[in-house]
Curated annotation (Swiss-Prot):
EC main group: hydrolase
Protein encoded by which gene: casB
Chain intervals with Pro residues compositional bias: 39-74
This protein's UniProt keywords: Apoptosis, Hydrolase, Protease, Thiol protease, Zymogen
GO term, biological process aspect, one: proteolysis
Biased segments, Low complexity type: 29-38
Molecular function, one GO term: cysteine-type endopeptidase activity
Active-site residues from the entry: H222, C278
Name of the protein in question: Metacaspase-1B
Organism: Aspergillus niger (strain ATCC MYA-4892 / CBS 513.88 / FGSC A1513)
Biological role: Involved in cell death (apoptosis).
């Protein structure tokens, strides 16, 4: 079932300052990867219990997007820049974010601390990150690709984006005019999820982000793996997503997505990412990975120093940021010897910002399409929305377990939670719903 989108601002009527600018060059300089060789995405996973998909749905017309200026380079962590306050908003729901509702009480998970946080014992004193209080501007990029007419066509990805946009607007205060939606059932060429449009939209999402802004990216489509070319992956493979034109333009590698959307972010900016695709466990290359028990696992932080952090202590999962695995001390000392903060950030894939990602499966797993509520859906997208509709105020640990409980017994995939910094798993997870703060 496919919906006709009638809301202004889904893929058009954006404010003038949001400009796409010129198309990116065909060959990207660093930090973009050269995807000279790539493999087609696999077919639908065997867990998909439905008949072959029908033909393409009727085309939907979307008004052309407003002009989007080409995003200027954002300052990297450690470089000098003049802080600017978050932009003022005239929208009622944004004005109300500055006063916490009394309903946030004893039975609700605590909000994250607002002071600057240290990465842990052994880290340089200036190596810090900042949680977001999510009182600033809200922007969302939603990408759904059914690969209409292609051999490995999917059924639920466009529905995922339709449902996610409604959910974010109605429950979390994201305005339609602050969303960019890319789906392959649109007539407007700027709203087609080809590689160039996806990369431009990712740049738009993070452009001019200020402390306490809430950015959101959702991808539903094919994902895969490709041999790692820069030696930063423990298993020797990079995670990739497949744009609509992957056969001619190539895939998009996790290194590139990290460089575009994570590396430029300033302290206190929240980026929430949902990747509902195969092999998406570390699609943003975030170093901290958590289990349903809240225990830090499989950290990539010490790879460059040839250290083992697999025995990282449970304090991260319990919200104790005062300590870190003892084995990390030597690595951080090495990073402090003459390296700039930016170099350390690039090397470790950490960030001073507040970046959290839920992915549909581990790096080695496939994700399933499902049929829920009378329509085809991505399993993670469906479970994410359902659990937060039933219980909006959950901690990270509760939300991860809720999603897994929805999927358990129906699918073999295990969703993952990863972060750019040590995460207090008992803290409140997402930005407050409008009903809690209006």
């Amino acid at each position: 079932m496919y919906y006709h989108h009638s809301h202004q601002g889904w893929s058009g009527d954006y404010p003038r300052q949001q400009s796409w600018g010129q198309p990116p060059p065909s060959s990207y300089p660093y930090p973009y990867s050269s995807n000279a060789q790539y493999q087609p995405p696999p077919g639908p996973p065997p867990t998909s219990h439905y008949a072959p998909p029908p033909g393409p749905p009727p085309s939907h017309y979307y008004p052309p997007p407003g002009s989007y200026p080409s995003p200027a380079p954002s300052p990297y962590y450690g470089q000098h820049h003049t802080p600017t306050p978050p932009p003022q908003s005239s929208s009622p729901h944004q004005r109300s974010y500055h006063n916490h509702s009394p309903s946030w009480g004893q039975n609700l998970p605590p909000r994250p601390p607002q002071e600057s946080q240290h990465f842990g014992r052994g880290a340089p004193s200036n190596y810090r990150f900042q949680y977001s209080n999510c009182t600033g501007r809200r922007k969302a990029l939603l990408i759904g690709i059914n690969y209409i007419g292609q051999p490995n066509q999917l059924r639920g990805c466009i529905n995922d984006v339709t449902n996610m946009s409604t959910f974010l607007n109605e429950k979390y205060g994201y305005r339609r005019e602050d969303m960019v939606i890319l789906t392959d059932d649109q007539k407007n060429p700027m709203s087609i999820p080809n590689k160039a449009n996806i990369l431009r939209a990712m740049q738009w999402l993070v452009k001019d982000a200020q402390p306490n802004d809430s950015l959101f990216i959702h991808f539903s489509g094919h994902g895969g793996r490709t041999p790692d070319l820069d030696g930063d992956e423990e298993d020797g493979y990079d995670d990739v997503i497949y744009p609509l034109d992957y056969r001619t333009a190539g895939h998009i590698v996790d290194d590139d997505m990290h460089a575009i959307m994570v590396r430029p972010l300033r302290p206190g900016v929240r980026l929430t990412a949902i990747f509902d695709s195969c092999h998406s466990g570390t699609a943003l290359d975030l170093p901290y990975v958590y289990s349903t028990q809240g225990i830090l696992k499989e950290p990539n932080l010490a790879k460059e120093a040839a250290m083992d952090l697999f025995s990282a202590i449970n304090s991260y999962g319990k919200g104790d940021l005062s300590s870190v695995a003892q084995t990390a001390i030597g690595f951080f000392k090495k990073a402090a010897n003459g390296d700039t903060a930016r170099q350390r950030t690039v090397m470790t894939k950490t960030s001073p910002a507040d970046v959290v990602m839920f992915s549909g499966s581990k790096d080695t797993q496939t994700s399933a399409d499902t049929f829920q509520d009378g329509e085809a859906r991505g399993a993670l997208s469906w479970a994410f929305i359902k659990t937060l509709q039933q219980r909006p105020n959950q901690s990270y640990l509760q939300l991860l377990n809720s999603i897994r409980n929805e999927l358990e017994g129906k699918y073999t995939q295990k969703p993952q939670l990863s972060c750019s910094h040590p995460l207090g798993m008992c803290n409140a997870s997402l930005v407050p719903p409008r009903t809690e703060i209006d």
